[in-house]
Structures are given as C-alpha cells and as structure tokens.
Amino acid sequence: MRAETIEALRESQRLGFLGARPVEQAAEHAAAFATALGPLPDGARLIDLGSGGGLPGLVLADLLPRCSITLVDRRQKRTDFLQRAVRRLGHEHVEVREADVAVMARDVEAGVETAFDVVTARSFGPPETTLRLARRLTHAGGTIVISEPPTGQRWDQGFLQELGLNDERVGPVRVFHVKP
C-alpha cells in the first residue's frame, strides 16, 4: 500500500470521516476486499458504496489499477474529499460520484446505467438493505464483498436464496456470488 494513500486516509480521519482505529489497521482490513476478490479481468467495473472516508475504495484503487472504480457517497463534503484524494493519488481509473445508491440501483434496473461486475461496501447501512442494493447494482455472475463483524452469522440463507446469491466468508469480509 502506498504511503500517499495512508496519508490520505489520515486526512480523512482528521476530517471525521473515519473512526479512531489506527489507519494502518483499517487499510489492512480494506486490502482484504481485494484479496477476497482474487484476480479480476482488465476493465472490470467496481463500485464502492458509501465511500466517504475512503475505505475500502482508496485502498482498492491502489490494489486494482486495471479496474474501473466508482466511489459513491451522497454527502458532498465526503465526495469533495475523495475527489481531492483521487486526484492527488493519480488514480485516473477512479470516478467519484455524489449520488444516492438507491437511485443508482433504479437506474441500473431501468437500463439507464450499466450494472457492475463488483460491488463493495463497508459500514454502509443495515446488512439486508446493503445487500439488497448491492445486488440490484450487480449483473448476473458478478460479485459483492461486504465487511463482516468478527463473529456470528448475520445472513439469513432464505434471504440470500431470494436474491440469487451464494456466499462465503473470506477473512474479515463476506463474498457473495450472484448466480448467472
């Protein structure tokens, strides 16, 4: 991970966009998203939901330079920060959008927006809401990665079946595979 990315995350923390956890630990946790995904094809489209503080989005931008990454948050202060950070880090493969994820999901379903190959989320919202929105943004055969609490099973298998998902825990994240 680049030192410049760690510094951008420290700035995010100073602005109150990240919690008190040491930035290096938070960045390592974010790197687990890329590890869980494994190799992605060049040009794969990834969207990070609620990217405001830069995790995991800025870390993924470092680790997945051949992907087209969209960082989305509905708060302008956070998207302004992300745009500055992306510019400073030279991530030409990253787009920052100030948008409501539910509106984006409707646009994908209406064919106005193209579905994504990968959706990531960390501390976005209630688990079922997060997963339902992520599924609406992901095409058949795509992948969703969501951060997990250290213990416990919070995903009802009937709900996952309803959404057409298979899941597995990979370290600190849960990976959902959208059935083709």
Q: Predicted segment positions?
A:
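Class I SAM-dependent transferase core
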Residues: 1-47, 77-94
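Active-site phosphate/pyrophosphate- and oxyanion-stabilizing loops and adjacent acidic/basic residues
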Residues: 31, 58, 132
